[in-house]
Curated annotation (Swiss-Prot):
The keyword Acetylation applies. Residues 38-48 are annotated as: Core. Residues 1-48 are annotated as: Transactivation. It comes from Human immunodeficiency virus type 1 group M subtype H (isolate VI991) (HIV-1). The modification N6-acetyllysine is found at residues 28, 50-51. Keywords: Acetylation, Activator, AIDS, Apoptosis, Host cytoplasm, Host nucleus, Host-virus interaction, Inhibition of host innate immune response by virus, Inhibition of host interferon signaling pathway by virus, Interferon antiviral system evasion, Isopeptide bond, Metal-binding, Methylation, Modulation of host chromatin by virus, Modulation of host PP1 activity by virus, Phosphoprotein, RNA-binding, Secreted, Transcription, Transcription regulation, Ubl conjugation, Viral immunoevasion, Zinc. This is Protein Tat. The gene is tat.
Length: 86
């Protein structure tokens, strides 16, 4: 292991920063890209603000789909389903 310059900050030590930038890919290689990627992607730990998800309102065309279906009366047959015998 190479000696580390004590006058240099730890985040500037050689090998402390990955050569490539972090991305949004969740493959195994990208999950182990750096410590931050491992925490965020591999373990699912996010520090910071949580984005507030807005509920999607139903479009008017979907709200009216219940009124388009006519209600059919239920046929209540008792006895022989072939019809009344005389």
């Amino acid at each position: 292991m190479d000696p580390v310059d004590p006058n240099q900050e730890p985040w500037n030590h050689p090998g402390s920063q990955p050569r490539t930038a972090c991305n949004n890919c969740y493959c195994k290689k990208c999950c182990y890209h750096c410590q931050l990627c491992f925490l965020k992607k591999g373990l699912g730990i996010y520090y910071g603000r949580k984005k507030r998800r807005q509920r999607r309102g139903t479009p008017k065309s979907l709200q009216d789909h219940q009124t388009l279906i006519p209600k059919q009366p239920l046929s209540r047959t008792s006895g022989d389903p072939t019809g009344p015998e005389k």
